[in-house]
Amino acid sequence: MLKVFNTMTRQKETFEPITPGVVNMYVCGPTVYNYIHIGNARSAIAFDTIRRYFEYRGYQVKYVSNFTDVDDKMINEANKEGITVPELGDRFIAAFKEDTAALNIEPATVNPRATEHINEIIEFVQDLIDKDYAYPVDGDVYYRAHKFSHYGELAHLNLDDLEEGASQHTNDEETARKEDPVDFALWKGAKPGEISWPSPWGAGRPGWHIECSVMSTHYLGETFDIHGGGEDLIFPHHQNEIAQSEAKTGKTFVHYWLHNGFVTIGDDNEKMSKSLGNFVTVHDILKTVDPQTLRFFMSTTQYRRPIQYTQQNLDTAERNLERLQTAYDNMGYRLKDAEAGNDPKVEQETRQIVADYIDAMDDDFNVQNGIAKVHELARLGNVYAERPVVFAGTLDFIRQTLSDLLSVFGIKFAAAATLDDDRIQALIDERLAARKSRDFLRSDEIREQLKSQGIILEDTPQGTRWRKEN
């Protein structure tokens, strides 16, 4: 029974989709004024892993993730570069697709742009005005937060406290136009030189929150299963989406709210931010880090937990991924001399590991326990491959199962590659270092990795030599 942690109720709940066998989910995408940073990647990878697990369990998933392609950041960056907002958006949407493809993130079913839905946004805002949930002021339109009785519920915040905080942080000019400091913009009147669209309230552009309400309900309906995003979006963004959408439809907007944790940088666990100078883009990281390593590192931490981005943690992820690859290669190597047939006992052990894996992942996508079962299966495969007599059917079964479980994390096994002399020597040097540090497990893994690719090591008093298998 699959359970998810619902931010709205602050507890794990049994997942029951609106339509049996179908999951409709919306995840807030990036504002496309720059390359995505690792915080954006963390969210994209976390929810891609969740999506993949739903698909592994047999669900049909409709996955919608938007591009915010008009807002203050977009306008400021476009003006700085002397280009149009659409030109800026096109450039970084293309960059987003390139980065996410490198990380093996499945394309969304739909990737809507806010600017593709301006007419719907205007109609949505007008409906809120007609229902007295919104009011126009000098070309802007604001939402009456106090009129929505559940405002603040998602973040478990009190409206009175929010009003006090908003009055302290809102600029005087904007506060003077609002009925209440906590009211928020649905439509922003155009300033000179800004991109804008005509509306009943004058030329302007949509507010950030209304964009997601319109796009999510357009593609998934007035009520859908899952809404996801980073925990920094709980308030005000997701709370405002709820207020807008439920005021318009009178229906529950979303059944399950899922939020991923932050990324911290370095050994000091600093939260990533531009002001601290530790802002890191995926575009830059992938110049020096293998995409599969970054993907594996980020997808094997439970989505609600923070991730500590350090070189040491990346190195650990790389080693763990190499161990899994080595096990996969070892079994592939033994297929050459395997006998026809199956080993029912070993295959039953494999099925039990899969059952345990599902139990782990059904518990709010507990990837730490899930990946532990993947490693357990790899060990089973390694041990079986060392037997004098092995059966091809069983080797194939374990290898395919290992591949299937790991694919949930967005990882693909590499085909056995031809090693050049430099790579062989690098692995021999790594094996020597492992033996000196008494890491005999890693030493043996390297020997088996090379053996699986036809390279035989011979330890002599003069050092380690290698030869190609005849």
UniProtKB/Swiss-Prot annotation:
**Gene Ontology annotations of biological process type:** cysteinyl-tRNA aminoacylation
Q: Which residues bind Zn(2+)?
A: C28, C212, H237, E241
Note on how the cofactor is bound:
Binds 1 zinc ion per subunit.
InterPro entries in the record, alphabetically? Cys-tRNA-ligase (IPR015803), Cys-tRNA-synt_Ia_DALR (IPR015273), Cys-tRNA/MSH_ligase (IPR024909), CysS_C (IPR056411), Rossmann-like_a/b/a_fold (IPR014729), tRNA-synt_1_cat_dom (IPR032678), tRNAsynth_Ia_anticodon-bd (IPR009080)
Principal place of residence: cytoplasm
Entry keyword annotation includes Lipid biosynthesis: no
Which metal ions or organic cofactors does this protein require, according to UniProt?
Answer: Zn(2+)
Q: What are the alphabetically sorted keywords of the record?
A: Aminoacyl-tRNA synthetase, ATP-binding, Cytoplasm, Ligase, Metal-binding, Nucleotide-binding, Protein biosynthesis, Zinc
Q: Which residues form the signal peptide?
A: none
> Which protein, by its recorded name, is this?
Cysteine--tRNA ligase
Organism ancestry: Bacteria, Bacillati, Bacillota, Bacilli, Lactobacillales
